[in-house]
Swiss-Prot record:
Originating organism: Parafrankia sp. (strain EAN1pec)
Biological classification of the source: Bacteria, Bacillati, Actinomycetota, Actinomycetes, Frankiales
Comp. bias regions, Acidic residues: 442-460
Originating gene: tig
GO cellular component, one term: cytoplasm
InterPro entries: PPIase_dom_sf, PPIase_FKBP_dom, Trig_fac, Trigger_fac_C, Trigger_fac_C_sf, Trigger_fac_ribosome-bd_bac, Trigger_fac_ribosome-bd_sf, Trigger_fact/SurA_dom_sf
SUPFAM superfamilies in the record: FKBP-like, Triger factor/SurA peptide-binding domain-like, Trigger factor ribosome-binding domain
Transmembrane intervals: none
Annotated compartments: Cytoplasm
Name of the protein described by the UniProt record: Trigger factor
Length: 507
């Protein structure tokens, strides 16, 4: 067999494959044997029908066509391997020449991974926001914590912002009552904005027993987009009374005995969260800089697949919250064209980032050991709320394990670049990024337990392939580090422990 590769573009090639009939003959013979078992001919036992009889019954041309179709996947695969083509799409195959007893010639066009030429990065410089925490931020956090321990006391006065009211609600559209839009005794914090548009303005200044009617646009349900007439009856007004900010409050709200100890702990936790946010900012800016420095074309099929996947995820999420695409775009204040252009740009950036990081993996010979992979499985299983061994088996059954391994490799490549970068804040101060480290102790024992669930063959590191989750693992690792740190602190201060790294634009 002879294969010739023609480069059509940086992301597309054409293979021309010539197969002598002698090399095709084993496939032809195998097809005759298969048909001899399938075709029933009087006077011949199954599997004993001679080729000449099959030719008479089915036609020599039909049999040769079937032999070629069954041989093409193998021949194509051999040609791809021989020419070392990194395929990213289904091939478009065309048989250009074939006659009985003569050679088979076919072509195959496919999208391929573009060649990425990495520049000498040197010491890349990134500028991020400072990780400082102000006194005002600490006090704001303490106020939020006090808010969680507030008590509600009935008052006999008109409704004010910040009050909690008990409401009876009903709604109608064009005089027709909406059955599933009624509520009795609903508690609502005035001014929070988490009920329906217009409710705050309608009940402002109302007293216990007052009835107010207003119009609002429905954003979900059967009457989405319609204007509804809503009636709200105030059934009680309560004001929120915050506890004094003193040592007694510190004892009640935390493990600390004094207010100063609590205040210091809140500052430490906020600083930890800011370091995680700082890492997320550095990560995103590194990806932006890589795309700026390295020109990478995006294969059409890969971009189309990514856009389709994103549209599918969006549709699933919108269905889950009970709304549609048009309403969602209206909420964003974007036209369909603007939204699609933004998604397309983001998807292209994600794919380019993947290709560049994959090139870094190759250039730096970045590898992956079993322990690193198992740590990721353990972490993701915990976040998914399933047993680690069950999560590992689910990955092994499909292509999830391959995708996870590629993500971890890309994460390592990104962190290597961050380690070698010069990072300063906007005030010119050097920044030491809070890069995650390997776990120890009990975590290592858990990792070893999970590894028993996967065969060694399943842990062979694949060539990094395009994935919609280009740098998700980078965010996951940083989040895991921050979460582990927060878990060691007993203060449950209104989200101080929730240090999720902002999702990368490439995720």
């Amino acid at each position: 067999m002879k294969a010739t590769k023609e480069t059509l573009s940086p992301t597309r090639v054409k293979l021309t494959v010539e197969v002598p009939f002698d090399e095709l003959k084993p496939s032809v013979d195998a097809t005759y044997r298969k048909l001899a078992r399938q075709v029933r001919v009087s006077g011949f036992r199954p599997g004993k029908v001679p080729p000449r009889i099959l030719d008479q019954r089915l036609g020599r041309g039909v049999i040769l066509d079937e032999a070629i179709q069954e041989a093409l996947p193998r021949l194509y695969s051999e040609a791809v391997q021989a020419e070392e083509v990194d395929v990213l799409s289904r091939p478009e195959v065309d048989i250009t020449e074939f006659a009985d007893g003569a050679q088979l010639v076919f072509t195959a066009e496919m999208d391929v991974r573009p060649e990425v030429t990495l520049p000498e990065f040197g010491e890349l410089e990134l500028v991020v926001e400072p990780a400082t925490v102000t006194d005002e931020q600490v006090e704001e956090h303490l106020t939020n914590l006090r808010d969680r321990f507030a008590v509600l006391k009935p008052v006999e006065r008109p409704v004010q912002e910040g009050d909690f009211v008990s409401l009876d609600l009903s709604a109608s559209v064009d005089g027709e009552a909406i059955e599933d839009a009624t509520a009795t005794g609903m508690s609502y914090e005035v001014g929070s904005g988490n009920l329906i548009d217009g409710i705050d303005e309608a009940i402002a200044g109302a007293s216990d027993g007052d009835e107010r009617t207003f119009d609002t646009e429905l954003l979900a349900g059967e009457y989405t987009g319609r204007t509804a007439q809503v009636t709200a009856v105030v059934r009680g007004v309560k004001e929120k009374e915050l506890p004094e900010l003193d040592d007694d409050f510190a004892t009640t709200a935390s493990e600390f005995d004094t207010l100063e100890e609590l205040r210091a702990d809140v500052r430490t936790r906020l600083e930890s969260n800011r370091k995680v946010e700082q890492l997320g900012e550095a990560r995103d800016k590194m990806l932006d800089k890589l795309i700026e420095l390295v020109e990478v074309p995006v294969p059409d099929s890969v971009l189309a697949g990514e856009l389709e996947a994103r549209e599918h995820r969006l549709g699933h999420e919108l269905e889950h919250i009970g709304t549609d695409r048009a309403t969602y775009l209206e909420t964003l204040g974007q036209s369909a064209e603007e939204f699609d252009a933004e998604v397309r740009s983001s998807a292209g950036k994600a794919i380019r980032s993947q290709f560049i990081l994959d090139a870094v993996i190759d250039a730096e010979s970045i590898g992956l050991d079993q322990g690193e992979l198992m740590e990721q499985i353990l972490m993701r299983a915990q976040r998914a709320g399933v047993q680690p061994d069950q999560y590992a088996q689910q990955l092994a059954q499909g292509e999830g394990l391959t995708a996870l391994m590629a993500d971890v490799l890309r994460t390592k490549a990104l962190f290597l670049l961050l380690e070698n970068a010069k990072v300063v804040d906007t005030e010119g101060n050097a920044v030491e990024l809070n890069l995650p480290r390997r776990p120890s102790g009990e975590a290592e024992d858990d990792v070893r337990d999970i590894s028993d669930e996967l065969d060694a063959e399943e842990l062979e590191v694949p060539a990094a392939a395009p994935s919609a989750e280009v740098t998700a693992a980078a965010g996951d690792e940083a989040t895991a580090t921050a979460t582990a740190t927060d878990a060691d602190t007993a203060t449950d201060a209104d989200g101080a422990g929730d240090s999720e790294l902002p999702a990368s634009e490439t995720k």
